[in-house]
């Protein structure tokens, strides 16, 4: 007796911590992590990730549990902060505020030393570490959170408050400090531009 084919899901389930693939017109693909998903002031379904993961116009594809077709597009980026904005097709995406062991209920400011923050990345999952410093000039936080390639864009939270994203590790993954953009700075830049993503609120 033939085994019935498994139907593809009607919508991709995505939230902060989901693995995403970003594909350019040449077919090059990067694997990163979605920082957060929600609606902007105009009601559009949008997300945020690390800017170095792709460029405006690149297709965004869920890495897991999907049929490999795009569900969104990078529509804007902020190179000084290494932040990118994704506009999603609401007919193809079911946004959630919990991925794995991490829940996001709002946004806020990073903690100071020796506060602990955690991230949820597509490569290393949920890991936590002490906050070494927050650079208010460069809008960065330095933490001891373990990250590896593919964790770029991962949400950094304190409790359930989204305070930043993962952008890079210094020299040695999971041993050296990790650098990330603060969510205050990311949302401030997006709001100031007044385009897609302005007025963002997470699911």
Q: Where in this protein do the model-derived segments appear?
A:
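A short, polar/proline- and glycine-enriched secondary-structure boundary/capping micro-motif
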Residues: 56-61, 152-156, 173-181
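Short, solvent-exposed secondary-structure boundary/capping segments
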Residues: 82-85, 138-146
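Serine endopeptidase catalytic core focused on the charge-relay Asp
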Residues: 26-135, 157-159
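Short, solvent-exposed aromatic-acidic interface loops
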Residues: 50-54, 146-149, 167-171
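Short N-terminal segments immediately surrounding and downstream of signal-peptide cleavage
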Residues: 8-26
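Secretory targeting and sorting signals
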Residues: 1-8
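C-terminal cap/linker of serine protease catalytic domains
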Residues: 88-101, 170-203
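Catalytic nucleophile loop of clan PA
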Residues: 146-166
């Amino acid at each position: 007796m033939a085994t019935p084919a498994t139907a593809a899901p009607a919508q991709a389930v995505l939230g902060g911590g989901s693995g995403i693939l970003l594909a350019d017109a040449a077919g090059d693909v990067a694997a990163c992590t979605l920082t957060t998903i929600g609606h902007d002031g105009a009601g559009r379904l949008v997300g945020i990730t690390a800017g170095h993961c792709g460029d405006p116009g690149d297709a965004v594809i869920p890495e897991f549990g999907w049929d490999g077709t795009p569900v969104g597009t990078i529509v804007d980026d902020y190179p000084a902060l290494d932040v990118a904005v994704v506009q999603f097709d609401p007919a193809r995406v079911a946004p959630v505020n919990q991925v794995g062991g991490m829940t996001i209920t709002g946004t806020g400011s990073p903690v100071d030393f020796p506060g602990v923050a955690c991230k949820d990345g597509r490569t290393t999952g949920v890991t936590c570490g002490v906050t070494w410093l927050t650079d208010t000039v460069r809008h960065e936080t330095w933490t001891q959170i373990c990250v590896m390639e593919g964790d770029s864009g991962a949400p950094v939270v304190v409790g359930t408050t989204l305070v930043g994203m993962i952008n890079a590790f210094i020299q040695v993954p999971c041993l050296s400090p990790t650098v990330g953009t603060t969510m205050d700075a990311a949302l401030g830049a997006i709001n100031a531009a007044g385009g897609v993503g302005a007025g963002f609120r997470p699911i």
